[in-house]
Regions:
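C-terminal beta-strand-rich structural cap/linker in extracellular carbohydrate-active enzymes
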Residues: 417-433
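Active-site beta-loop-alpha junctions enriched in small/polar residues
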Residues: 12, 43, 103-107, 162-164, ...
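Active-site-proximal helices and loops of the catalytic beta/alpha 8
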Residues: 88, 144-147, 160-245, 262-266, ...
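Short, well-ordered coil/turn segments that N-cap beta-strands
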Residues: 3, 34-36, 94-96, 153-155, ...
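Substrate-binding/active-site clefts of carbohydrate-active enzymes
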Residues: 3-37, 41-152, 173-181, 195-197
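Conserved, mostly hydrophobic/aromatic
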Residues: 9, 30, 40, 66, ...
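Hydrophobic faces of well-ordered beta-strands that scaffold small-molecule active sites
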Residues: 5-7, 38-40, 98-100, 157, ...
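Loop/helix patches that line or flank the sugar-binding groove of alpha-linked glycan CAZymes
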Residues: 2, 48, 251, 256-406
Length: 433
């Protein structure tokens, strides 16, 4: 699998909050980022305007009707499914595939349909009721839901909290729907690392979040003083699973890089970005506005709210800049260009399909290389090789990085020592062959 880029977006917070706001200009913008899949979050109809609902309009994960879409997303609510079909057609015509959410664990308390459910919820998800997967009606309906959306042209599903659902049921569902729609992809939200291989090899998911792996590792390096060596330990643990995990630095559940609760400045996210995007052949997910520094400041916890109407300024400015409005602010434009450059590089064969050589093990004795705050690796094919040097510190680093003989034997014409000047919390990408 070549490296795929997934772009997650909540249509309710883009433009005027309508399906139609994902127009040709918006989709052309995604083309400049090298996106392959657009994950439209919050499409199936969820509960709103009820006492149990969290926020206004409410959570996209409290579904009240699995065969409908949210009326507020349509220009004409009476045509809302037709307008979603038109969004699918526009997105496909622009060269992208479409993901939507599949939420097998729960529904909203006011759900009416064949899914059997209990009168209790998991944790603090008080706007939901737990699904009863022991009921044949639940299993049949959850399969029919997948077929309903796949038949409309949806290309895959991001599957919510799958560890809370019987694995054998999910395995049967995936096998059954793929018999009819073999090109569908299923992306699993899995948190227990010991379950990774099971959900990929046995249950049948195509990709799964590496939240508890690389995301948590990079966050600890950035925020808790953890050693950068732990990045090595994570990919070593993943081993052959690396191409089938989905790396990310932001999504709707996590705090924004630029939020005070994370890095405080989105520009400090370039070092972790280089590792998450470029270290291996894992797939990568980008959360809308991340590339221009959206900081979640309009919320109370550093997240862009999935519960309430909001007007994130960076998203507003990005949309306006694509539709004849003012250009992005210089700092936003500069960050966007850095993202574009790295995303473009990620599509080159050396990064999309090539080998990785982690250089930390052979540079611990180099006087300018601090293996706790610096991380370096080479990505290579027979035709080219790139050095990526990351600086997780507040001080600039003038690094001299040793390239071991084993690597040079595999990649002729590489230097024995490479030099890289890396700004604080930044990454340097150098073609060395």
């Amino acid at each position: 699998m070549s490296k795929k880029i997934i772009y997650q977006a909540l249509p309710r917070l883009w433009g005027r909050g309508k399906f139609s706001d994902w127009d040709e200009a918006s989709l052309r913008y995604l083309q400049t980022l090298g996106v392959d899949y657009v994950w439209y979050t919050g499409v199936p109809r969820h509960a709103t305007g009820k006492p149990f609902v969290k926020g206004n309009p409410g959570s996209p994960y409290a579904i009240t009707d699995w065969r409908d879409v949210n009326p507020y997303l349509a220009e004409d609510p009476a045509r809302r499914l037709a307008e979603f079909d038109e969004l699918l057609a526009r997105t496909h015509a622009a060269g992208f595939k479409v993901l939507i959410d599949y939420i097998p664990n729960h529904v909203a308390p006011d759900y009416q349909g064949p899914i059997c459910r209990f009168d209790w919820c998991d944790g603090d998800w008080t706007d939901t009721c737990k699904n009863d997967w022991s009921a044949a009606g639940t299993r049949a309906e959850m399969l029919d839901i997948l077929r309903f959306w796949a038949s409309r042209g949806v290309d895959g599903f991001r599957c919510d909290m799958v560890e809370l659902v019987p694995a054998d049921a999910l395995q049967a569902l995936i096998a059954a729907v793929k018999a009819d729609f073999p090109d569908l992809i299923f992306v699993a939200e899995v948190y227990q690392k010991d379950n990774y291989r099971r959900y990929l090899d046995e249950v049948g998911f195509d990709l799964l979040y590496d939240k508890s792996g690389l995301y948590d590792t990079l966050r600890a390096v950035c925020c808790s003083g953890a050693t950068a060596r732990s990045i090595t330990w994570n990919w070593q643990w993943l081993a052959d699973l690396q191409p089938r995990v989905l790396n990310f630095l932001e999504n709707h559940d996590e705090q924004r890089l630029g939020s005070p609760e994370f890095l405080g400045d989105a520009r400090r996210g370039l070092a972790p970005l280089a590792c998450s995007l470029l270290l291996n052949t894992a797939q990568f997910m980008l959360y809308f506005g991340q590339e221009v520094g959206e900081d979640g400041i309009e919320g109370a916890d550093g997240r862009t709210s999935i519960f309430n109407w909001s007007d994130p300024p960076e998203l507003r400015e990005l949309y306006a800049s694509l539709h004849g409005g003012p250009a992005l602010a210089p700092d936003e434009a500069a960050l966007l260009e850095r993202y574009r450059a790295m995303l473009s590089l990620a599509k080159r064969p050396a990064f999309a399909e090539g080998g990785t050589w982690d250089l930390v093990y052979c540079n611990g004795d180099m006087p300018r290389f601090d293996p706790d705050r610096h991380f370096a690796f080479v990505r290579y094919t027979e035709q080219e090789a790139w050095l990526v040097a990351c600086n997780f510190s507040d001080r600039p680093a003038a690094l001299r990085i040793r390239l071991p003989r084993e690597l040079r034997d595999r990649c002729p014409r590489l230097p024995e020592i490479a030099s890289a000047y890396v700004k604080p919390w930044d990454a340097r990408l150098l073609r060395i062959r």
